[in-house]
Amino acid sequence: MKGHYSDLWHRIALAAPDRPAIVTVGESTLTNAEFDAAAARFAALLVEHGVGRDDKVSILLHNRPEWLVAFAGCLRIGAVPVPLNFRYRAGEIAALLDDSDSVVLVYGASLAEVVADAVAQVGRPLTLLQVQDVAAPLLPGALDFAEHAVREPLPHADAVDGEFFIYTGGTTGAPKAAMWGVQQMLSMQVYSLYLSAGLPLPESADDVVRMATDPDSAPIVALALSPYMHGTALTTVINALLLGGSVVVLPTARFDARAAVRAIVDEHVTRVAVAGDAIAIPLVEAADELGIAELPELRAMLSAGMRFSDSTKERLHSLAPNLVITDILASTEGGAVGLGITRSVADLPSRFRMTPGTVVLDDALEEVQDTPGAVGKIAFTGGMPRGYYKDPEKTAANFVELRGKRHIIPGDLVRVEEDGFVELLGRGATVVNSGGEKIYPAEVEEALLQFPGIDDAAVFGIPDPRWGEVVAAIVATARPEKLDVAALAEHVGTRLAGYKKPRRVLVVKDLERSPTGKIDLAVVRERTAKEGVTP
């Protein structure tokens, strides 16, 4: 089915104007009509400031209604929403503002200090729209985001296909902007979206609106506990709106597991997006602390790109007897290449089944997905981004034409099992995946080497029961006994996002590199886990 999120949301708002669209717990509710009008007013504000089709609008916010209003408003005029990581430091934000050619930055007042520094580093004019998530003065030259509320809504016009960017986590260098077509994303989502809701596949926009406004349909209430800048969280909430459901937003910026459990109960949440164990474990523990024995209304939980252990899934199935957990093997650049679906404890241990369009390639780039025991890189031939923005070389390297089909090869190594299942072996690189955030070792090493007295450094991940992996480092200095490891970690934290700071550090006099400059990573990782210190 062809369609555009903007058009469909507008039609749903006309057909069911009074249904809740976005509920901020304990604060406010936007109905479908109010959300539609807010998006139209924000679109008018953008146009007033010279923003048009294909112009880039960066969004640097925690999960808030304004995030979704900005996203929807961009789609209405063909502007390109560019979600940014609110954990980034000024230099990282400036680099992405520059890389994306953003002309507008929507940001939270709580992030104003880092934004001011980032904008100064960009060194070119940007339209700044400040969301008052905390009481704070506007940055010089900034506009209050709430000003859009006094604009006349931009009249609706049928949307023409546009784009939105999702930045990679930087597994092979600096983050890259994957350019997703809006209509392409919708067509990719339709199959899993409607089947997971127990609905027939729509053949037309009329079908979408009819099912979204059917009074007899089971209500869809979605809560994303991972940030909207991540693909799984974003698609969870925008697809809930497409089904005629509502999105629940927590009022606090920081993840609060107890508040999340209370919201699931009080707001009758039916589906939740998480980042594996990093969020799911505190969620289960919070339910225990609150004396909540069962979450019967919770029917779906989705997670992607993060360790999600069977022991955690077992606890979740016991807590939520009607829950279907979908563990998604995916990358920013491609669709879901594998799904680990469990409906009860009986389905454990969970296994990844390859999705249609997924293949496994050996070193010669030949397909081996039909050969049990074969090891290779998993690849996807279905819907995928148009490429990386302004990076034709990396686009050509990662989006490969093979046997007449375009393939995205994200680099994950798998072992082929029987009946279409695969076992994930690793990322095929030294990237650290911590809580769903990908951390490129080179940038952390660079920060470590800027600390006085550090002669050499290597960064890698070590296993962690909650986050999957945490950043660890081995550093060389002439006098190991004199090194202040806590100060070293804080030094990194002043230059990079907090989650990139080393959580385990081994201090030595020499890294004992080989003549070619390499270290035995397996040995170093084991030594650091056993002998390293926690800052």
Question: Residue locations for each model-derived region?
Answer:
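Conserved pre-ATP/AMP-binding loop-to-beta segment of ANL
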Residues: 149-169, 173-174, 213-221
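Gly/Ser/Thr-rich phosphate-binding loop
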Residues: 170, 243-245, 270-274, 285-349, ...
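Conserved beta-loop-beta connector loops within the AMP-binding
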Residues: 359-381, 418-419, 481-485, 520
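Conserved AMP-binding A3 loop
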Residues: 31-33, 163-203
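Conserved ATP/PPi-binding loop(s) of AMP-dependent carboxylate-activating enzymes
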Residues: 366-400, 437-439
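Conserved AMP-binding/adenylation subdomain of ANL enzymes
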Residues: 188-224, 229-271
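Conserved AMP-binding/adenylate-forming core of the ANL superfamily
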Residues: 21-50, 55-64, 89-94
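AMP-binding/adenylate-forming catalytic core of the ANL superfamily
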Residues: 88, 107, 386-387, 397-398, ...
